[in-house]
Amino acid sequence: MGVQVETITEGDGRTFPKKGQTVVVHYVGSLENGKKFDSSRDRNKPFKFIIGRCEVIRGWEEGVAQMSVGQRARLTCSPDFAYGATGHPGIIPPNATLTFDVELLRLE
């Protein structure tokens, strides 16, 4: 499956991240059963990463790159676009499909 992007709230439709740009997002990550495993919103601190530097899972690299500034979307990432057969011990089980509610706040 890779990554599926479903828009929750439209962005500006014009400003998309480019390779090498820093994106600033708020997100909530959930397992298939709906259990939340991580949230920048709970910490009240947006998360930043650089597009194209493999700093995040592939589902984020490809999914967030399709979003425009201001957009909020649900990213559904198959295991091969998330943490794969290894998972993240104690947090994400092996071969887990993950869902992220991501809002692209701005580019830097």
UniProtKB/Swiss-Prot annotation:
The keyword Cytoplasm applies. It catalyses: [protein]-peptidylproline (omega=180) = [protein]-peptidylproline (omega=0). Gene3D superfamilies: 3.10.50.40. The keyword Cytoplasm applies. Residues 20-108 form the PPIase FKBP-type domain. Its EC number is 5.2.1.8. GO terms for cellular component: cytoplasm; cytoplasmic side of membrane; cytosol; extracellular exosome; membrane; ryanodine receptor complex; sarcoplasmic reticulum membrane; terminal cisterna. It is an enzyme of class 5 (isomerase). One of its GO terms (molecular function) is activin binding. PANTHER family: PEPTIDYL-PROLYL CIS-TRANS ISOMERASE (PTHR10516), PEPTIDYL-PROLYL CIS-TRANS ISOMERASE FKBP1A-RELATED (PTHR10516:SF301). This is Peptidyl-prolyl cis-trans isomerase FKBP1A. It comes from Xenopus laevis (African clawed frog). The gene is fkbp1a.
